[in-house]
Amino acid sequence: MKTFLISAAFPVIAVTLFALTASPARAQQKNADLKPVAWDTFVRAESDKYFKSYVDLGGFGKFFHIRKPTPIDAQSVIRMNRDTMYSFGVFDLTTPVTITKPDTGDRFQSMMVINQDEYLPVPVEYKPGTYTLTQEKVGTRYVMVGFRTFANANDPGDIKKVNAIQDQIKVEQESVGKFEIPNWDQKSQDRMRDALNVLASTLTDASKCFGTKDEVDPIAHLLGAAFGWGGNPAMDATYLNITPKKNDGKTPYALNVKDVPVDGFWSISLYNDKGFFQKNKYNAYSINNITGVKNEDGSYTIHFGGDPKQPNYLPIMDGWNYIVRLYKPQQEILDGKWKFPAAEPAK
């Protein structure tokens, strides 16, 4: 069984949105005044690219909300999640912006702030309140603020509740300003990204890729911008990417887990060999500790294949694999003292 440990937050949604908005017409602007991208400008160019994708979707000076969970029939990138719904906005800090994070009670909601150098100038926030961002505090003229809010993807009523929560996110700013970025040369940017991804493929630990300027390693941060722009520290979200040994689609697996040391929540999402959710008649794609069925002892048993009448059942196919997402993991997970149990062939 292969297991990879990574940390992540907004890379997937960033890639998703860029894929949705990209087109030959906007992919490369006019050749006049192209600004070449080198190793020392790559992070800024990459941030500007993603910021522009959010702006193009209507998220400039205000928040653009993803109103539904990941659609099974329209997955634009691999290994998307159906645990949370996203809200995001890009702001010109020529004038300060104040953002109100609503009180969501026991429901998980995070607010992440990323500047143009892909640093997190303030910690990921989970508490309700008002937060004022200035250019002095953030460090760059533009900033991206992203929310992710827990949602039960199989419950239309819960999705409506999340939509109402999204509408409670408020923005106050004297002037929205303008969005003005260099005309980065996409060809040199693509070449630089490809080269950095070759180096990034040798990384076994992403813990120094994302965070504040003081927390990251400069080289790891550069590589992180290439393979997963917008990732946040492992202390906020840690993923385990697992491929079972006998993932032939015929051998059922199971795992039992109890008392997972997270302050947020955990989930398991199952993908096919291409990394996508594979449509099934059970509408079963992921399990989490909020909506999953507990055993009498408080543990959860996840069934991969086998009897579809079992609780917490996920259908499997040839080449299947899964990701465990751990939101706000406690120190014993980060230290490796507690490990999420792996799925084993069912007895």
Write out the residue ranges for each language-model feature:
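Positively charged n-region of N-terminal signal peptides that target proteins for export
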Residues: M1-F4
